[in-house]
């Protein structure tokens, strides 16, 4: 990666290290994200979204290895892993048993965690440079439509909001969500 392309990530990585919530393009809409290991940042994201912690959150990553500190990989058999890996990187979010030490702010009232390996190049670069996954939820204030452009993010959240500019992918719908243990579809994509 050139130093020029690395430079666009520097203020966003700094914001993440400073426990701030950021906005970035994903496959379908702009996402709001933060450091999953920062209770302060996760609480700020939940407050911004007016989202109850009990619902749980999604982690988005550059690769599966970034997710393993948060999920119980030993709960999966080879077939479940193969099915999951066949869909990644891509627009399928899998609900996987969480490690017991994974924050309840991430899992909510569940013993599982929703995770996805993104195929959006900016998300992959962002997670690689940050060195871990991000909490990911749609960029919109309660009652408003998810943002599909940087301009819409700035209209809803203000011009000073930490924003990784770029284009969303071509998907019209949010990611499909499936349970890895049962294969059950939780949300249609």
Curated annotation (Swiss-Prot):
Gene3D superfamilies documented for this protein: DHBP synthase (3.90.870.10)
UniProt domain YrdC-like: residue ranges: 6-189
Segments forming a coiled coil: none
UniProt cross-references to InterPro entries, sorted A to Z: DHBP_synth_RibB-like_a/b_dom, Sua5-like_dom, TC-AMP_synthase, TC-AMP_synthase_SUA5
Record-listed E.C. numbers: 2.7.7.87
Single annotated GO MF: ATP binding
Keywords: ATP-binding, Cytoplasm, Nucleotide-binding, Nucleotidyltransferase, Transferase, tRNA processing
UniProt record, GO biological process: regulation of translational fidelity; tRNA threonylcarbamoyladenosine modification
Annotated Gene Ontology cellular component terms: cytoplasm
Pfam family for this entry, one: Sua5_yciO_yrdC
Catalytic reactions on record: L-threonine + hydrogencarbonate + ATP = L-threonylcarbamoyladenylate + diphosphate + H2O
Cell compartment(s), UniProt: Cytoplasm
Family: Belongs to the SUA5 family. TsaC subfamily.
Free-text function comment from the UniProt entry: Required for the formation of a threonylcarbamoyl group on adenosine at position 37 (t(6)A37) in tRNAs that read codons beginning with adenine. Catalyzes the conversion of L-threonine, HCO(3)(-)/CO(2) and ATP to give threonylcarbamoyl-AMP (TC-AMP) as the acyladenylate intermediate, with the release of diphosphate.
Protein name (record): Threonylcarbamoyl-AMP synthase
UniProt organism field: Serratia proteamaculans (strain 568)
